Amino acid sequence: MSYTIEGATGAWELVIGLEVHAQVISQSKLFSGAATAFGAEPNSQVSLVDAALPGMLPVLNRECVAQAVRTGLGLKAHINPVSRFDRKNYFYADLPQGYQISQFAHPIVGSGTIEIELQDGSTRQIGVTRLHLEQDAGKSLHDQDPTRSFIDLNRSGVALMEIVSEPDMRSPEEAGAYLRKLRTILRYLGTCDGNMEEGSMRADVNVSVRRAGEPFRTRCEIKNVNSIRYVMQAIEAEAKRQIAIWEEGEEVDQETRLFDPSRGETRSMRSKEDAHDYRYFPDPDLLPLVLDEDWIEGLKASLPELPDEKSARFVSEYGLTRYDAGVLVAEQASAHFFETVAKGRDARLAANYITGDLFAVLNRTGRSITDSPISAEALGGLLDLLADNTINGRIAKEVFEAMAETGEHPADIVEARGLRQVTDTGAIDTAVAQVLEANPDKLAEYRSGKDKLFGFFVGQVMKAMQGKGNPALVNEALKKALG
C-alpha cells in the first residue's frame, strides 16, 4: 500500500528527490595537490589554487575522475565519453574564487538506477539522473567569537560527486533506504567513506506533495542534511508544512530551507535559485574531459563484487534468506566476517549467530564488527564444537556470552568451566530414571495419553544434567523409558 499523509481534506502523496554530495576518496583535491585529510588544523591544507590567488590554474586530478567513473559503473549508469567543466557563479565568503567549478550541461555520468529493499520485503528501482564532479567550498565558522566569523579553506577544492536521483521516492522510508543503499555501494567501491557525521556525505532533499495522480506541484529543497534519520524527519515535517499551506488555499513558494532537528521543523533559508541565476559557462581554464573506452573498460573489470551481486550469491551459494543476506552485505566487513565463519560450516547457523547474537553484542557495546570482541575464527570454533557434539545449543549460548565478555577461545571456556556435553548413555539413563521416579503423577498422566508432557520430562532431565545432556540422546532414552 502506498504511503500517504492524511490532511484535513484528504490524503496527500509525497514526491521526493535527493541530491547527494559525496566526498571523493583521494589523497589530493580535484584541481590541486593539497591534502584532503579530515580534522587537520584550520587552513593547513590549502594550496595557492584553493585560495584562488591570481594566476593560479586548475590541474585536473586523474584519480578523482577514475573514482567518479567507478561510482557511475557501480550505479549501472552510462559513462559519458566527453564531459565538460563549467563555472557556477555566486558569492559566498568561503568560496574564494567567486565561482565553483562544476559540471552543468555535460556531466561525467548519465542515468543509472539503484534498487532498494523496504521493510516489508518489497523492492523498488530508483532512477539516478546524473553524477557530476565539482569542488567543495570552504567552511564558515560562526561560533568561535561573538562578533566575528572565521573561514577554514581546508575543504575548499575537495572533490565532490553530486549524485542526483529522479523524483521517484514516495515516503521517508524509501528515502532512507535509498541513502543507505547508496552509501553501501560507495563504500564497497572505495569511492566515498559515507561518514555523514564528518560531512563526507550530505543530502539536499527535494520535497513536494500532490493528490494521487496529479502532476508535480511546487517543490522545496532542504539543504545539507547530515544524517539519514534527519533526512527522514525533514521529509515528514516539510510535507506536513506544505499540506497545511495547500489546504488553506495558498501557494507553496519554491525556496531553499533548513531542517532544525531540535524543533522538528524546516525554516526558510532563501528563495530557490534556477540555473540562470548562477550564470553557468564553460570554464576557460579546463579542456573538455575525453575518456578512452579501453580505460573505462579497465575500471569496470577492476570493480569489486557489489552488494546486490554479493547478496544474490549468499542466497544461492549458502542458502540464506534474502533478508539475512541483505543484512550481512550492508557492510563489507560483516559480509567478509560471515564468509570467514561460514567456510566449511553450517552457513545458515553462522548467519543466525552473526545477525542475532553477535549484532546484539555489538549494539549493546557500541562497537562495529571490525572491533568485535569475538573474532570470526573464534565464532567458527564455537560452531565446530556444536557440529562435533562437544556442546549443545543451550551450552553454546552460554559459551558465546563468555566469549563476548572475556575474548577467550570457545574450547578453552568449555574446558575451564566443564561444559562438555554428556553423551554417556549410562549417565543419561540414570538421570531419566531419577526424573521419572520423582514425578509419578506426571508419569501416570503421560501414560494415560497426555503426550505433551514429553517436553516436561525432557526439560527436567536437562535440568538434572545442568543442561549438558545431548538432546538427541536424552529424547531417545526418554522414549525408551516411557514405553
Swiss-Prot record:
<dbReference type="InterPro" id="IPR004413">
    <property type="entry name" value="GatB"/>
</dbReference>
<keyword id="KW-0067">ATP-binding</keyword>
<dbReference type="GO" id="GO:0005524">
    <property type="term" value="F:ATP binding"/>
</dbReference>
<dbReference type="Pfam" id="PF02934">
    <property type="entry name" value="GatB_N"/>
</dbReference>
<dbReference type="InterPro" id="IPR006075">
    <property type="entry name" value="Asn/Gln-tRNA_Trfase_suB/E_cat"/>
</dbReference>
<comment type="function">
    <text>Allows the formation of correctly charged Asn-tRNA(Asn) or Gln-tRNA(Gln) through the transamidation of misacylated Asp-tRNA(Asn) or Glu-tRNA(Gln) in organisms which lack either or both of asparaginyl-tRNA or glutaminyl-tRNA synthetases. The reaction takes place in the presence of glutamine and ATP through an activated phospho-Asp-tRNA(Asn) or phospho-Glu-tRNA(Gln).</text>
</comment>
<dbReference type="Pfam" id="PF02637">
    <property type="entry name" value="GatB_Yqey"/>
</dbReference>
<dbReference type="InterPro" id="IPR003789">
    <property type="entry name" value="Asn/Gln_tRNA_amidoTrase-B-like"/>
</dbReference>
<dbReference type="GO" id="GO:0050566">
    <property type="term" value="F:asparaginyl-tRNA synthase (glutamine-hydrolyzing) activity"/>
</dbReference>
<dbReference type="GO" id="GO:0006412">
    <property type="term" value="P:translation"/>
</dbReference>
<dbReference type="GO" id="GO:0050567">
    <property type="term" value="F:glutaminyl-tRNA synthase (glutamine-hydrolyzing) activity"/>
</dbReference>
<dbReference type="InterPro" id="IPR017958">
    <property type="entry name" value="Gln-tRNA_amidoTrfase_suB_CS"/>
</dbReference>
<dbReference type="InterPro" id="IPR018027">
    <property type="entry name" value="Asn/Gln_amidotransferase"/>
</dbReference>
<dbReference type="InterPro" id="IPR023168">
    <property type="entry name" value="GatB_Yqey_C_2"/>
</dbReference>
<dbReference type="InterPro" id="IPR014746">
    <property type="entry name" value="Gln_synth/guanido_kin_cat_dom"/>
</dbReference>
<protein>
    <recommendedName>
        <fullName>Aspartyl/glutamyl-tRNA(Asn/Gln) amidotransferase subunit B</fullName>
        <ecNumber>6.3.5.-</ecNumber>
    </recommendedName>
</protein>
<comment type="similarity">
    <text>Belongs to the GatB/GatE family. GatB subfamily.</text>
</comment>
<keyword id="KW-0648">Protein biosynthesis</keyword>
<dbReference type="InterPro" id="IPR017959">
    <property type="entry name" value="Asn/Gln-tRNA_amidoTrfase_suB/E"/>
</dbReference>
<keyword id="KW-0547">Nucleotide-binding</keyword>
<comment type="subunit">
    <text>Heterotrimer of A, B and C subunits.</text>
</comment>
<dbReference type="GO" id="GO:0070681">
    <property type="term" value="P:glutaminyl-tRNAGln biosynthesis via transamidation"/>
</dbReference>
<dbReference type="InterPro" id="IPR042114">
    <property type="entry name" value="GatB_C_1"/>
</dbReference>
<keyword id="KW-0436">Ligase</keyword>
